[in-house]
Amino acid sequence: MNFLRKIVKKRKDEDTQKPSPVSAPPDDDDLWLPPPEYVPLKEFTSKKNMRNFCINGEVKVCSPNGYSFRILRHILRSFDEIYSGNHRMVGLVKVVIGLTLSGAPVPEGMNWVYKLRRTLIFQWADSRGPLEGEELEHSQEITWDDDTEFVGLQIRVSARQCHIQGRIWCINTSSRACQLWSDMSLKTQMSEEDKDSSLLLE
């Protein structure tokens, strides 16, 4: 009888050790990070180089075996080298990617889709940033693989200037978005006139 108990116990131990099938992006390699916070539009002291943009962002992660944010962060660290869009708006694209990937993904077949739709305020330092009235339609595919894993990122960002009341994009410096911006080397500086606002340097 003891022998049978040992066999049953051993089988139970084996069952608990088996990895469960991947049904959601694994997040065991990430500390939980709070979502970004948005500050409603207010009166800015400085009006220079300020633009209100209606944003649509989508990042589709294609991976047959699931993925971790460690891999996504690894891919995004080389973003400056692989970005193929309008370089006057690369800072805006980085902001949108970070905010998009901070949301909750929706499964779509073997893919995971992150989406963002929002009106955001952007301020650029000096004479940087897009031209007046300039819009952006950017799509790009980035793939990464080694002997064990394949991950593809399909990025789409559209931005058009609009007059809908917007929000400052983020003040929560401990959010995942800020972690991803750091990985992409987003260049910003704090606004001297508006303490809640960051000026884009790219």
Curated annotation (Swiss-Prot):
Domain comment, as recorded: Late-budding domains (L domains) are short sequence motifs essential for viral particle budding. They recruit proteins of the host ESCRT machinery (Endosomal Sorting Complex Required for Transport) or ESCRT-associated proteins. Matrix protein contains one L domain: a PPXY motif which potentially interacts with the WW domain 3 of NEDD4 E3 ubiquitin ligase (Potential).
Source organism (scientific name): Rabies virus (strain China/DRV) (RABV)
A Gene Ontology cellular-component term: host cell cytoplasm
Keyword Membrane: yes
Complex and partners: Homomultimer. Interacts with nucleoprotein and with the cytoplasmic domain of glycoprotein. Interacts with host ATP6V1A; this interaction plays an important role in virion uncoating after viral entry.
UniProt key word Phosphoprotein: yes
Protein name: Matrix protein
Pfam entry (one): Rhabdo_M2
Location within or outside the cell: Virion membrane; Host endomembrane system; Host cytoplasm
Organismal lineage: Viruses, Riboviria, Orthornavirae, Negarnaviricota, Haploviricotina
InterPro entries xrefs: Rhabdo_M (IPR006870), Rhabdovirus_M_sf (IPR038617)
BP GO terms, sorted: viral budding via host ESCRT complex
Membrane topology category: Peripheral membrane protein
Other facts: Most abundant protein in the virion.
Site (Involved in the inhibition of stress granules formation and contributes therefore to virulence): V95
Regions of compositional bias (Basic residues) in chain numbering: 1-10
Primary localisation category: virion
Family: Belongs to the lyssavirus matrix protein family.
Alphabetic keyword roster: Host cytoplasm, Host membrane, Host-virus interaction, Membrane, Phosphoprotein, Viral budding, Viral budding via the host ESCRT complexes, Viral envelope protein, Viral matrix protein, Viral release from host cell, Virion
